[in-house]
């Protein structure tokens, strides 16, 4: 059992978002798509978490700029 299987994140309801934070995430994902794709397909739980996060972040009220470093850490 890996440590991240016990890891649980509970996010507060969405609050707000700027257009710049969406651009930051898009840039991270576009920089090295093949590497990120390989990482995520090899780790289905991370893929599901990212899919859920991206679905939530489409709500423009969600401030996720503070999560940029965490997204970068998880994807590398």
Curated annotation (Swiss-Prot):
Protein's UniProt keywords contain Disulfide bond: yes
Keywords: Disulfide bond, Late protein, Redox-active center
Source superkingdom: Viruses
Annotated disulfide bonds: 17-21
Induction: Expressed in the late phase of the viral replicative cycle.
Nucleus in keyword set: no
Subunit structure comment from the entry: Interacts with sulfhydryl oxidase OPG072; this interaction involves formation of a transient disulfide-bonded intermediate, allowing disulfide bond transfer. Interacts with OPG088; this interaction involves formation of a transient disulfide-bonded intermediate, allowing disulfide bond transfer.
Function: Late protein which probably participates in disulfide bond formation by functioning as a thiol-disulfide transfer protein between membrane-associated OPG072 and OPG08. The complete pathway for formation of disulfide bonds in intracellular virion membrane proteins sequentially involves oxidation of OPG072, OPG128 and OPG08.
Family that this chain belongs to: Belongs to the orthopoxvirus OPG128 family.
Protein name stated in the entry: Protein OPG128
């Amino acid at each position: 059992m890996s440590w991240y299987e016990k890891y649980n994140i509970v996010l507060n309801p969405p609050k707000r978002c700027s257009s710049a934070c969406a651009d930051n995430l898009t840039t991270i994902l576009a920089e090295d798509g093949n590497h990120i794709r390989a990482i995520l397909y090899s780790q289905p739980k991370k893929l599901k978490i990212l899919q859920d996060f991206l679905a939530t972040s489409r709500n423009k009220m969600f401030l996720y700029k503070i999560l940029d470093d965490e997204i970068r850490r998880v994807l590398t």
